Amino acid sequence: TWAYTDDLPSVKLGETDYTKTKPNGRHGATNENVKRYIDFAAENGLDQVLVEGWNEGWEDWFGHSKDYVFDFVTPYPDFDVKMLNEYAKSKGVKLMMHHETSASVRNYERHMDKAYQFMVDNGYNAVKSGYVGNMIPRGEHHYGQWMNNHYLYAVTKAADYKICVNAHEAVRPTGLCRTYPNLIGNESARGTEYEAFGGSKPFHTT
């Protein structure tokens, strides 16, 4: 689980006090775990480590159609952003940011400047963005024009901050990366992760 605690059936950003909760012991994005992966990356010639589940809000992030799930700048108590980035730098490795939006695109756009500035302030130069779930606002779809406009907005905004974007659950590549080379990837194919929840048919190719 990405969640930090099982004590809360729901969370409210800005109101939930995680310092008064008991960690569930299954939260992977901890200082200890991340340092271990940084060490592994340094020893094996890998230059970047992606860490998902580092920020508050994962307790009920999926399936509840909540407009405001993440603020993209508030870490769980067991994830020290400054210390981990300094540790990674000392090993010749960088951390990659993760922004799961829970398909609440309006919320992401409201927080985007603050989120990107947080990355710059803490030494991040790349982000994996995610869009799991049914789009908010309702009626929009992952591959519709409204979302294509959003993907363009996110990439151009990231360019202002000199940040690279790897968009997950995004539209298939359209050539946008020729104009904005900071768009380094679109994870849009039905890949191996589907084996965790239903799998893919034998005739499916990616």
Can you say where each PLM-predicted feature lies in the sequence?
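Conserved structural scaffold segments of CAZyme catalytic domains across common CAZy folds
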Residues: T1-K91, H99
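Aromatic- and carboxylate-enriched substrate-binding clefts and catalytic-loop regions
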Residues: G53-T206
